[in-house]
Amino acid sequence: MNRARQCLMVMASLALAAGALTGTATAAPPGTAPPAQEQLLTTLDPQRLAASGPRQESMSAALPAGKTCTDLPASKGRKDGARACTEVTRTAGSRTAVPLAAGTCSVQPGYYHFDRHSYCLSDARLTYTLYDPVNGSVKGVGEISLSGSATLDARSGWWNELFTATVTRLEGNVRSLAVKLTASCANSCGMLNADAWGTKVLVLGQSASSHVTFSSYPARGTVTQITPQYALQLYQPGDTPGDWSHNWSLPTKVRCDAESAGYGCVIGQIRVQLNLPLSQWGAAAATYWYGQAALVDHWGAPDNPLRRNKNEAQAIANRYRTCKEGSSIPFYKQDDIPTDSCDEYPFAGTFQGGKDGGSCAEILPKFEGGTWKIYYFLDRKPTGYEPCVRGHVPLKQNTDAGGEVGRFIQDERVLDAEQFTVSTEG
């Protein structure tokens, strides 16, 4: 009998040792300390991320410089011929402020500002100068302020661009200006409205405002890069405008695609950011934060963005390898995390996803005492050199975060292999 009892004790000891090697945790009653196999790795103060908030990329570029001149014949208002030039004015020292009726554009005057879903032009100055054709002396000057704004639609192939032109300066023989603005576009694009306002004759302080409309409907599964183009005519009433105008193109391209359901347009040059704030996405966001902040590859940071993989079969295979039976170390659900599930980072739907789950850092994010605490299994302490992270995340937070990633792909028109960053701030 004593010998049998000793054998049972040895078998029990072996079973406990095996459980420790596989990382199995003992369930903890609510409100008690974590199981003994779990150790605190680090903490994350929600206020630290909430203070800064997410940052979206943007860019700016100057209105392209240029000068266009033409010889004018005599007219009713001028007995002799003249030479007229229209050019972009770069100096801003003597500018008269004008309201930006075409929309507020937070960039220095004379520049375009772009983000993923819009672009605008801020108070660009263009001058019309009248020269004596014989001695080249200046006979008169007119100036306009041109501002514009456009909002792209991620679920439509057309958009309006609103313009406002205001006469800000008239000198000498230039007492008014005729202003005409038209638009066109290149590469699988058409104009629903090419002429902003026809021809408007304006005196000092007067404005003209209206819009042009671009349209693009690429074939299903294709992508097109559109270049909006513009032509501005400034001349004096009574003169023949002729075939000359001041021409320029938008300094970036508008990308329209039909890769997924429907059409949509964005500024593809602006890299987009996926926002999954810790305050909203809880343990899922804490897992992504840890993967980006604590692991050597810091996936999804600006200097190491993720790349979308639209192959759904590959995403399923990636998830199988990281979180399911394909992992060399199984994922064991923990009783002290309600509806525990495996959430992986990098995401399965990226080219960086699909790492062996056995090679991932495995963490248990828990919100305790107003702070996120990141635990690990005693026999699998993360080193920071793992290529991925598996988080123990309540199932609803996991699936809801996955749904948000799907909405992000649609709302931002993220194409296959396109880069994006991830932020858990806010």
Predicted segments with their positions:
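Nuclease and nuclease-like effector domains acting on nucleic acids or nucleotide cofactors
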Residues: 30-339, 348-426
